[in-house]
């Protein structure tokens, strides 16, 4: 049997030692890897917060008056946040302010991400509706229905209860009391909520312009006529002056928009004179103001009605329906000379009334 030399024994020793050391290092690495993996799993199971912006979608409804405890519970129940206490502490530390509304959120959101959504009113889900100046109630109901999906008949039905909106007793309908503007309504808003907001906005405008409540109805009535007649901003104040002058001398207003008006939307120009007299809105027939507004006046029409420019005009006619150019006159003869320009424009634009 061959004997191993001392030099060979030394080489074997070092080789064996290296193998043992390598195995030890591998074992240590495996243990370390297992520890890191287990630790990550443990933290994932025990952490008090989700990571990131979340996933999926869920709507959370915040009501007016909800406090931090209730808001936190709603988020927890909806699966938005993971832990009640940690989110509630965030609210306390942030001096949180909440805004009522419906918020589109995600499932499994981090506390910070969830808080950022709720802390801004602009994140609430809303309907944006623009009601132009001069729209009549029937048009407003249709526009609101188109945007919100609430049937126009429901708006009309809700509008019948005038006492619920604090409208003056002399008003027979809600016509004229719905302020024309751009609104953002909560997606959960009812027909009554929406109309109530519009009436409140009109009241605010009347108060801002210094109109006493006893004069609300008459002011809105005249302003609605000014709104339907005037085309260009400077002319609002002149049209207002024409009507003020006519009222002062007991002259009929004789304004075309009152001929067609009815709350239901029916064109009253197509009914008999007897029906028009009974209806009471045709200012070519009645004396003074009609029973109520014929449309929703905006801020400009209200201001012009309250502050007509100085002048002694009794007549006006828009001679260019496209540009809105309007002529004002003191006498009937002067007025009729201006009407000639309108007739000429109509001949040059024969399809205008069909568009």
Residue ranges of predicted features:
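Conserved catalytic or metal-liganding residues and their short signature motifs at active sites
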Residues: 1-254, 297-300, 304-312, 320-355
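Conserved SxxK-family serine transpeptidase/carboxypeptidase catalytic domain
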Residues: 251-301
């Amino acid at each position: 049997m061959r004997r191993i030399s001392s030099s060979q024994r030394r080489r074997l020793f070092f080789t064996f030692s290296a193998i043992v050391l390598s195995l030890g290092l591998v074992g240590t690495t495996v243990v370390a890897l297992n520890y890191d993996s287990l630790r990550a799993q443990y933290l994932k199971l025990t952490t008090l917060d989700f990571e990131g912006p979340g996933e999926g979608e869920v709507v959370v409804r915040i009501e007016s008056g909800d406090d931090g405890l209730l808001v936190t519970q709603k988020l927890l129940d909806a699966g938005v946040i993971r832990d009640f206490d940690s989110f509630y502490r965030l609210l306390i530390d942030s001096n949180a302010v909440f805004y009522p509304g419906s918020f589109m959120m995600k499932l499994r959101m981090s506390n910070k991400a969830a808080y950022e959504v709720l802390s801004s009113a602009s994140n609430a889900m809303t309907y944006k509706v623009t009601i132009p100046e001069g729209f009549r109630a029937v048009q407003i109901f249709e526009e609101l229905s188109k945007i919100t999906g609430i049937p126009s008949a429901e708006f009309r039905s809700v509008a019948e209860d005038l006492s619920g909106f604090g409208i003056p007793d002399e008003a027979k309908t809600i016509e004229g009391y719905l302020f024309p503007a751009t609104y953002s309504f909560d997606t959960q808003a009812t027909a009554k909520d929406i109309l109530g907001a519009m009436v409140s906005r009109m009241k605010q405008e009347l108060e801002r312009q210094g109109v006493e409540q006893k004069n609300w109805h008459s002011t809105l009535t005249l302003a609605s006529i000014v709104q339907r007649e005037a085309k260009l901003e400077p002319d609002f104040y002149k049209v207002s002056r024409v009507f003020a002058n006519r009222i002062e001398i007991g002259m009929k207003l004789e304004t075309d928009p009152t001929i067609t008006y009815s709350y239901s939307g029916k064109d009253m120009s197509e009914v008999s004179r007897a029906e028009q007299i009974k209806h009471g809105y045709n200012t070519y027939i009645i004396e003074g103001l009609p029973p109520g507004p014929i449309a929703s006046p905006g801020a400009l029409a209200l201001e012009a009605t309250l502050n007509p420019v100085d002048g002694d005009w009794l007549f006006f006619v828009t001679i260019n329906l496209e540009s809105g150019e309007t002529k004002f006159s003191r006498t009937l003869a002067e007025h009729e000379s201006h009407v000639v320009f309108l007739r000429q424009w109509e001949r040059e634009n024969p399809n205008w009334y069909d568009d």
